[in-house]
Amino acid sequence: MVRNVIILGSHIQALGLARQANTIGVEVILVIPDRYSVAYFSNAVSKVLLYSTEKELYGKICSYKTNVKETLLFPTNDEMIEFLVKYYDEFNETFYMGIPKPETVTLFSDKRNTYRFCEKNHIACPHSWYPDTIEDVKQIADEVDYPVIIKPSIMYSFHKLFGKKAFRCNDKNELILRATAIAKRFP
């Protein structure tokens, strides 16, 4: 039986999760890197744990390990999902996991894997290219119909860097220029 939920991350979803858990009598522990979370101010949260490094985050979660599964780990953003995937086997022994098995997460968190899965199984998805170099982009630039978008395979680190989820390119020159600029900052 779930007695506690550890909500990982400061996404707005944390507030809704905290309120729902509190409504059914589950203790809510919010684990965030800073105080910039609306859930931080909620009376539905019984405890807030701040961390500054992954090692510190790991230690704070491990301090809630028990012999009986009674705590649910629930991420609210891609960064926290990636963290739980990294420690999935260890945490799954003592916590309920708010994510599926790592192979499922990997299939759907990386758009290259998702789109390839869809194509293989005849599921409609955007036509996509996966260039590794600017030379690949130049070759693709002659094959596509414009406008196109440049979108990363994994969103959260791209969005942190550029403040956008995608870039629209209206022609070949714009595609090559944007891809070159992105490649300099986002390997």
Question: Which role does the model predict for each range below?
Answer:
Residues L107-P187:
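Active-site nucleotide/adenylate-binding loops and adjacent lid/helix of ATP-dependent enzymes
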Residues Y36-A39, E103-L107, Y156-S157:
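Short gly/pro/ser/thr-enriched loop/turn and capping motifs at secondary-structure boundaries
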Residues M1-K101, E135-Q139:
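ATP-binding N-terminal substructure of ATP-dependent carboxylate-amine bond-forming enzymes
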